[in-house]
Amino acid sequence: MRTLLRLKRLMPEVLWTKRSCSSSSINKSILKHLASKIIATGPISVAEYMREALTNPVLGYYVKNDMLGAGGDFITSPEISQIFGELLGVWCISEWMAAGKSSALQLVELGPGRGSLTSDILRVFSQLKGVLGETGISIHLVEVSPKLSQVQAECLTGNQTQTYDNNHTFYRSGTTCTGLPIYWYHSIEDVPRGFSIFLAHEFFDALPIHKFQRTENGWREVLVDIDPENPGKLRFVVSHRPTLASSTLIQKDESRRHVEVCAEAGVIVQKLASRIAEDGGAALIVDYGHDGTKTDTFRGFKGHQIHDVLEAPGLADLTADVDFSYLRKMAGDQVICLGPITQRSFLKNMGIDSRMQVLLSSNDPSIRAQLIHSYDMLINPEKMGERFQFFSVLNTARLAQREQMQKSTVMPVAGFTELEMQ
């Protein structure tokens, strides 16, 4: 989950108009690269702009920066409190048990950040060895940033890893501090098939989005262009004609006047749904987002401050709220989707209050104060509590028993209630 400081600066939902920006600190290298592309082919989509700014192999924000923590541009929930990761670890084991206790369990995290979440989950796995028994557990991390993969390796293995060339499906491997095999991949497609619990914690919000605006001539795409009055600036423009994206990505029943669509998120969710349907398992997606109600959420962050999205590309984090209604549509009928449910509700359903009482009773006053502060950050509706959402994708067999058995005999999905099932 992105930095708590973001929560105090919500962006207004307005229609896009032509706009420009400048900065003395603009990343001239990537700006020159973007300008060359625009001159050659015309204005580019917001999705292409985000892709270049964030994941360009040489100049991208995620490729060359350590953007996490107090010195970076955002802080995540696992870094705020270990309780968060512990409860997600309990959720993973609960779903593994409910699905029949497969003899092998792959824990797959998309965009693992510093590795804090996986680290907390592995601690829970170690504490509950008696429950997991002889289950063959392996850890699989999907990470595009070389810098972050090194940070994750240090956190999870003590940096005892080996790197590989492109002839391998994984580019790094090792053994965790708890003795489990761990692998790093560039793409989810490279992760081995098998029963898996997928975690995507603040992953989907950074994927490239297309932006669309309803006009008197129909839907048009918002594009990024060079400001003709100042070649050192970028600006937003609205396409005069339909684009392939505006012709294919807008839902027929769309009623909003401005829409953001993350086609890449749809593709990834379809892959997750296919794997879960065929191999078993579950996915838990955690992000700030909405259920098809918001319009303009595209924004940038740099040094824990709101930052113009067109200024200094490659030097700032770019993000947009996740549209969970779109993820649900892309998952299709082959799986069951639960949520979104607020972080506050999910963590309370998972027993965070009981866990807090145990920790508060066994620590000194200074640690208790820190625990209370962390709890407030995670649960308070004005902070992370209502802003962030939990969404799950499950194998249809997980809840199929409802048709043949009384509800009291069916193991509920931890963290979710019946009202959240769609």
Curated annotation (Swiss-Prot):
InterPro entries the record matches? NDUFAF7, NDUFAF7_sf, SAM-dependent_MTases_sf
The catalytic activity, as recorded, is: L-arginyl-[protein] + 2 S-adenosyl-L-methionine = N(omega),N(omega)'-dimethyl-L-arginyl-[protein] + 2 S-adenosyl-L-homocysteine + 2 H(+)
Deletion phenotype: Impaired NADH:ubiquinone oxidoreductase complex (complex I) assembly.
Enzyme Commission designation = 2.1.1.320
Q: List the disulfide bonds.
A: none
User: Which key words tag this protein in UniProt?
Assistant: Methyltransferase, Mitochondrion, Transferase, Transit peptide
Q: Which residues form a coiled coil?
A: none
Listed transmembrane segments: none
Q: Which Pfam families match?
A: Methyltransf_28
SUPFAM superfamilies the UniProt entry points to? S-adenosyl-L-methionine-dependent methyltransferases
Where this protein primarily resides, as one coarse class? mitochondrion
Broad class of enzyme this protein falls into: transferase
Q: Where in the cell is it found?
A: Mitochondrion
**MF GO annotations:** protein-arginine omega-N symmetric methyltransferase activity
Classify the source by domain of life.
Answer: Eukaryota
> What exactly does this protein do?
Arginine methyltransferase involved in the assembly or stability of mitochondrial NADH:ubiquinone oxidoreductase complex (complex I). Acts by mediating symmetric dimethylation of 'Arg-118' of ndufs2 after it assembles into the complex I, stabilizing the early intermediate complex.
Family, per entry: Belongs to the NDUFAF7 family.
Annotated protein name in UniProt: Protein arginine methyltransferase NDUFAF7, mitochondrial
